[in-house]
Amino acid sequence: MTKTVAEIMTPEPITAMPDTPLKEAIQCLASHRISGLPVVDSSGQAVGELSETDLMWQASGATLPAYIMLLDSVIYLTNPNRYNQELHKALGQTVADVMTSKVHTIGHQDSLKKAAQMMHDEQIRRLVVVDDDHKVVGILTRGDIVREMANSYSQAVAPLRD
């Protein structure tokens, strides 16, 4: 794997801005069949990541109860409005409300070996690729690296078969 990240990455990835409505971002992930995307500011620099893991609460079907059951006791909420605000904050209405603000980035000129090591060490599935000005220029996934490994293997074995 002597290639650089720039040679393998997906250039110009789909991105979202922090104020993007969450519903729009979810539809984008689903329609493009991707599991996550970088969140960028107006200058194109990464400020977060939105992944399907961040969105898992959607499947929970959280509702606003008037009370909470705890150890067979009923506890009535003294301030349902505050609970409602906290619930909406937790569920989020924009990308900024649910995104992960820690961005895993790698430089476009870094090696694939470094990228693979980062993904392994951090236990992540994708890296946001940035240029020298820290602007998002691509995305690199585990799948991209595995495909490159398979391609390199095929090219190395082909001369042996001839």
Please tell me what each predicted stretch does:
Residues 104, 120-124, 151:
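Alpha-helix capping at helix-to-loop junctions
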Residues 132-140, 149-153:
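Charge-rich, low-complexity terminal tails
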Residues 48-51, 56, 125, 138-145:
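Short hydrophobic beta-strand motif reused across regulatory alpha/beta modules
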Residues 56-71, 145-160:
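A short, polar/charged loop-to-alpha-helix boundary motif
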Residues 120-121, 125-128, 132, 145:
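Extended hydrophobic
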Residues 50-54, 58, 62, 82-85:
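N-terminal short leaders/motifs
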Residues 30-33, 54, 63, 123, ...:
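Residue-level detector of secondary-structure transition/capping positions
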Residues 1-34, 39-42, 46-47, 72-118, ...:
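Bateman/CBS regulatory modules and CBS-like beta-alpha motifs in cytosolic regions of diverse proteins
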